[in-house]
């Protein structure tokens, strides 16, 4: 990702000024009660497991089965963009164009639109970061231009209510229907959209499906995964909760498609439209409120290029130069050894099908080696992209993990220490453990840290500090440019031993070993913790003493976890 080059002292100065702003650490301690006054309980979560409560994804599928498409009195087709802000290989958009072409044969005046809906309350409830929202706003402007070249206007609708309402509410359904009616001048509209797998979003879609009528028909599609949720099950038809066997099936599934084509994944490319609708391209009037931008360093921030082309060229660069070294370099803290594609993937500026198709070209015809341990660098890169699918599948299978609950419900009994002062020090990079502080400061300053960094800091928070992993999970969402609830919950569950296919509880990262292995010359640490630049082996006065003793805190974690599990 292209970012401004900053000197270490700038980084620290900027972090200090940000500290003055960051005051409400309590918001990370629990779900926001304004939006979730009655959070799900362990019993409620178990209802999904014992099938006494239907999973939202199943409800969507059931409702969709009953649907029939009718073009009667329909004049408008509209694609509703969500986390799929791209033209290239977008299933819902592709279907939208196909439906429109069918409709056009019946109604020569039919129109095709695209829409994006802003609900700031959804952003607040989900703790979307300023970095990510700024990226989305830039991407929308760019998308508006690209769509205009296809003669498709992109509308921006804002849903605001005085009482802070999420989009899974009946108020939203009314708002949405009314907006559609206005666009189609009182006739019917067909909406296409790609499914988002978090429960709030699925319940929003369910509500809309339940309120379908002749004025509004909704068509939802699987798009964000390479293999859609529900397609990979064990031979007994149950859901996988362990990655490796799931991944082997995933590979089989993908290879099966490849047998009949030259590509490994099917891409959905829209043909040029024979359609020449003219309209005035008006700049969007919306600007992000300050509350979402307060954590962004004003003087130095630099967003990655938001265009679809930038995502493609980033992929090309990565596959051309770095991917062959991925196995050795992906974890190094001082190198950019990974693709840096996550913000593009999270916001949907690039499809993971396209990524895997392109990466596959350098895999000698095999997406995975016969023995997993022999996977080449590029094969392992594809495997990482598969982890993203895995976590999405899991969120559909265990929906309570999208409602603030751990996958392993027994871990609710862990007696967290939850020291708010220790939490603040972790958040702001002042724990006195250099590697943790360097990573947390980088996160604050840039909105991005690599996977190893996320694992190190998540392990430190949940094990060494014994702070409920959900505090850290929320902090990450609020500060990551690529914040994605299923991967974030999945990653935190893995590191804190509370989630799906997690590390065993007795695996506690040793911070000294992590530092020696992934930043042996302290290049990364000295960049972000400039206090340590000139300190040979002595701890300088202006750098905090370690918040915990690593050995003692490890033993404490083992005991507390063991007592609960
Ligand atoms: C505690 C924790 C929190 C995380 N939170 C997020 C998050 O909010 N959003 C997010 O996109 N990823 C998250 N991850 C996964 C991973 O760290 C990032 O996807 C990755 O660091 C992004 O950088 P990259 O694009 O350069 O990755 P690359 O190594 O180049 O990987 C390419 C893509 O594969 C996917 N991917 C890679 N590793 C993982 C993984 N372990 N799990 C799921 N998908 C993966 C991502 O889409 C990534 O962009 C988290 C991991 C942990 C341990």
UniProtKB/Swiss-Prot annotation:
Subcellular location: Nucleus; Mitochondrion
Enzyme class of the recorded protein, top EC level: lyase
Main localization, broad class: nucleus
Entry GO CC: cytoplasm; mitochondrion; nucleus
Keywords, comma-separated and alphabetical: Chromophore, DNA damage, DNA repair, DNA-binding, FAD, Flavoprotein, Lyase, Mitochondrion, Nucleotide-binding, Nucleus, Transit peptide
SUPFAM superfamilies linked: Cryptochrome/photolyase FAD-binding domain, Cryptochrome/photolyase, N-terminal domain
Name of the protein: Deoxyribodipyrimidine photo-lyase, mitochondrial
EC number per UniProt: 4.1.99.3
Annotated site residues (Electron transfer via tryptophanyl radical) in this chain: 416, 469, 492
BP GO terms, sorted: circadian regulation of gene expression; entrainment of circadian clock by photoperiod; photoreactive repair
Cofactor(s) listed: FAD; (6R)-5,10-methylene-5,6,7,8-tetrahydrofolate
Family: Belongs to the DNA photolyase class-1 family.
Domain Photolyase/cryptochrome alpha/beta: 75-226
Function: Involved in repair of UV radiation-induced DNA damage. Catalyzes the light-dependent monomerization (300-600 nm) of cyclobutyl pyrimidine dimers (in cis-syn configuration), which are formed between adjacent bases on the same DNA strand upon exposure to ultraviolet radiation.
GO MF annotations, alphabetized: deoxyribodipyrimidine photo-lyase activity; DNA binding; FAD binding; mRNA binding
Residue numbers binding DNA: 514
């Amino acid at each position: 990702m292209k970012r401004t080059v900053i000197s270490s002292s700038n980084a620290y100065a900027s972090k200090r000024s940000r500290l003055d702003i960051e005051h409400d650490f309590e918001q990370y301690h629990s779900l926001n009660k304004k939006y979730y006054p009655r959070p799900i309980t362990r019993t409620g979560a178990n209802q999904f497991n014992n099938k006494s409560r239907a999973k939202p994804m199943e409800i969507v599928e059931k409702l969709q089965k009953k649907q029939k498409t009718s073009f009667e009195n329909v004049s408008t087709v509209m694609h509703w963009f969500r986390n799929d802000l791209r033209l290239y290989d977008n299933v819902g958009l592709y279907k939208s164009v196909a439906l429109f072409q069918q409709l056009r044969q019946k109604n020569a005046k039919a129109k095709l639109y695209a829409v994006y809906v802003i609900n700031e309350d959804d952003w607040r409830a989900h703790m979307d970061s300023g970095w990510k929202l700024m990226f989305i706003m830039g991407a929308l402007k760019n998308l508006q231009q690209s769509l205009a070249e296809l003669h498709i206007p992109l509308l921006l609708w804002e849903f605001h209510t005085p009482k802070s309402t999420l989009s899974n509410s009946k108020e939203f359904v009314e708002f949405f229907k009314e907006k559609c009616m206005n666009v189609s001048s009182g006739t019917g509209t067909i909406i296409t959209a790609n499914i988002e797998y978090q429960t709030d979003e699925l319940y929003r879609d369910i509500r809309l499906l339940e309120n379908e009528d002749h004025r509004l028909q909704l068509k939802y599609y699987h798009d964000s995964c390479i293999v859609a949720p529900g397609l990979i099950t064990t031979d007994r038809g149950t859901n996988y909760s362990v990655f490796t066997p799931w991944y082997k099936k995933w590979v089989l599934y993908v290879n099966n498609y490849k047998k009949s084509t030259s590509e490994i994944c099917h891409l959905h490319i829209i043909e040029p439209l024979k359609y020449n609708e003219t309209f005035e391209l008006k700049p969007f009037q919306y600007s992000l409120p300050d509350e979402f931008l307060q954590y962004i360093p004003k003087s130095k921030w630099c967003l990655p290029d938001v265009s679809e082309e930038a995502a493609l060229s980033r992929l090309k660069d990565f596959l051309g130069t770095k991917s062959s070294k991925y196995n050795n370099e992906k974890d190094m803290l001082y190198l950019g050894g990974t693709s840096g594609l996550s913000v593009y993937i999270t916001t949907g500026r690039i499809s993971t099908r396209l990524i895997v198709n392109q990466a596959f070209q350098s895999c000698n015809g095999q997406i995975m080696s016969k023995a997993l341990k022999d996977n080449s660098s590029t094969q392992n890169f594809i495997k990482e992209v598969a982890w993203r699918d895995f976590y999405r599948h899991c969120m559909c299978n265990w929906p309570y993990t999208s409602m603030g609950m751990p996958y392993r419900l027994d871990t609710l009994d862990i007696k967290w220490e939850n020291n708010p002062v220790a939490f603040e020090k972790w958040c702001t990079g002042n724990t006195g453990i250099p590697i943790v502080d360097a990573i947390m400061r980088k996160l604050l300053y840039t909105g991005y840290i690599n996977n190893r960094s996320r694992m190190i800091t998540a392990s430190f928070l949940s094990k060494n500090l014994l702070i409920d992993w959900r505090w850290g999970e929320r902090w990450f969402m609020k500060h990551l440019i690529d914040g994605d609830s299923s991967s974030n919950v999945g990653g935190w569950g893995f590191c804190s031993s509370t989630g799906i296919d997690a590390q065993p509880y007795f695996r506690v990262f040793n911070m000294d070993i992590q530092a020696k292995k992934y930043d042996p010359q302290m290049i990364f640490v000295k960049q972000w913790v400039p206090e340590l630049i000139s300190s040979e082996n002595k701890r300088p006065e202006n750098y905090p003493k370690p918040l915990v003793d690593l050995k003692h805190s490890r033993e404490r974690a083992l005991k507390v976890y063991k007592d609960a599990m």
